[in-house]
């Protein structure tokens, strides 16, 4: 976890985690934080599933999850993978396995790069409405059954050098965990750690862990406790971040960001998904925007722009739109658009280029802190583009 000095550092210090390969994509603290999503097509619809995966890949998604609720769905993954490879798409595939999923997981492991299991459902017993408690003997007996059921999958993944996600959901904890720990972050962590310890006992370490909840405070507490527990027990597995069932629109994006960005700022997280009730490809820009905003992974131009006030000397909203349209393909640059000289030059000091209102009908162009020239406002955007070209930092858009 963060040291006292790191807490006040402007650089994010990631928790050190081991590298887990998911196909050709590495997940771990030595690698860029990977962006993933999940298609919403029926897996038995081969053509539809392939099309959905290709749309995600085109949007920049780096890992795609697919639901496999039956053996038939698991076998369909082989056809989906072959169809993708025939079209030149090698994006890693993850199978989502839930209720009593051993047979399904063993089949689908042949066709995917990672298997995701839900500890609360992998060995599933229907809840007993008359039960009042679990004795230690009963709790341990179920644990033994879980290990017996889970071990064959671990062995297959180990032999095939595939990865596993232990994906806990707050809403689907096993009955014995609820009775013992309650509907709490601790219950989520213990649910995951039971499976982590089994993997460790079988010398299998290609593990990624998620602790998702639909409420950000629960999710935050669960991930923090999970990281602390792993550190205490000597495990350094990567974390997959997400707020599940976040909804749609602005609020869904804000809710996801509240959870994911908070943990990323604390150094936790090695891969992420923003779960929206929208077309899956709409999740991807949100993921990259979160990473960009924190300075963790730069995949677009960073625009710095003031909110505008009575001192603004031009239509800032319109000009920002024009500047963005002209330069949005110049990934890696920081460009500032500021309304006046009162705060503009200082607040944009870290930008590569600046566009600042200088006087009525006049703007000044900056390179870093240095004013380069003044030009009429009507020529401002064109002059900014020319300055970038003069510096050799311009590339033509695709």
Swiss-Prot record:
Which BP terms in the Gene Ontology apply to this protein?
A: isopentenyl diphosphate biosynthetic process, methylerythritol 4-phosphate pathway; terpenoid biosynthetic process
User: Which cofactor is essential here?
Assistant: [4Fe-4S] cluster
Question: What SUPFAM superfamilies does its record include?
Answer: Nitrite and sulphite reductase 4Fe-4S domain-like
HAMAP family from the UniProt entry: IspG
What task does this protein carry out? Converts 2C-methyl-D-erythritol 2,4-cyclodiphosphate (ME-2,4cPP) into 1-hydroxy-2-methyl-2-(E)-butenyl 4-diphosphate.
> What family is this protein classified in?
Belongs to the IspG family.
| Name the UniProt record assigns to this protein | 4-hydroxy-3-methylbut-2-en-1-yl diphosphate synthase (ferredoxin)
Tell me the lineage of the source organism.
Bacteria, Bacillati, Cyanobacteriota, Cyanophyceae, Synechococcales
């Amino acid at each position: 976890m963060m040291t006292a000095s790191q807490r006040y550092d402007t650089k994010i210090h990631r928790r050190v985690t081991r590298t887990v390969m998911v196909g050709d994509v590495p997940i771990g603290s030595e690698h860029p934080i990977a962006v993933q999503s999940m298609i919403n097509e029926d897996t038995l619809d081969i053509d539809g599933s392939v099309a959905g995966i290709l749309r995600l890949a085109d949007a920049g998604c780096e890992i795609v999850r697919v639901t496999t609720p039956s053996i038939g769905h698991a076998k369909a993954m082989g056809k989906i993978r072959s169809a993708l490879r025939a079209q030149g798409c090698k994006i890693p595939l993850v199978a989502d396995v839930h209720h009593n999923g051993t047979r399904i997981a063993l089949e689908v492991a042949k066709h995917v790069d990672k298997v995701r299991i839900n500890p609360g459902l992998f060995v599933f017993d229907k809840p007993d409405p008359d039960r009042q408690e679990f004795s230690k003997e009963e709790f341990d007996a179920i644990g033994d059954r879980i290990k017996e059921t889970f071990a064959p999958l671990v062995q297959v993944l180990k032999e095939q050098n595939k990865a596993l996600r232990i994906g806990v959901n707050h809403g689907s904890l096993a009955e014995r965990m609820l009775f013992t720990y309650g509907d709490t972050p601790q219950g989520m962590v213990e649910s995951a750690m039971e499976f982590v310890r089994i993997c460790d006992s079988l010398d299998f370490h290609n593990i990624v862990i998620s602790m998702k909840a639909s409420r950000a405070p629960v999710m935050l507490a669960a991930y923090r406790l999970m990281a602390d527990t792993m550190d205490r027990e000597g495990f350094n597995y990567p974390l997959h971040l997400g707020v599940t069932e976040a909804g749609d629109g602005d609020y869904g994006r804000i809710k996801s960001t509240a959870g994911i960005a908070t943990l990323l700022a604390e150094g936790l997280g090695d891969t992420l998904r923003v779960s929206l009730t929208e077309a899956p490809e709409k999740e991807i820009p949100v993921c990259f925007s979160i990473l960009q905003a924190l300075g963790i992974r730069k995949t677009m131009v960073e625009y710095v722009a003031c909110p505008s006030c009575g001192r603004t000397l031009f239509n800032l909203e319109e000009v920002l739109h024009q500047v963005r349209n002209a330069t949005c393909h110049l990934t890696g640059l920081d460009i500032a658009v500021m309304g006046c000289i009162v705060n503009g030059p200082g607040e944009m000091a870290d930008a590569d280029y600046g566009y600042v209102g200088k006087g009525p009908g006049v703007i000044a162009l900056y390179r870093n802190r240095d004013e380069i020239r003044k030009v009429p406002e009507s020529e401002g955007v064109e002059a900014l583009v020319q300055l970038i070209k003069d510096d050799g930092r311009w590339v033509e858009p695709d």
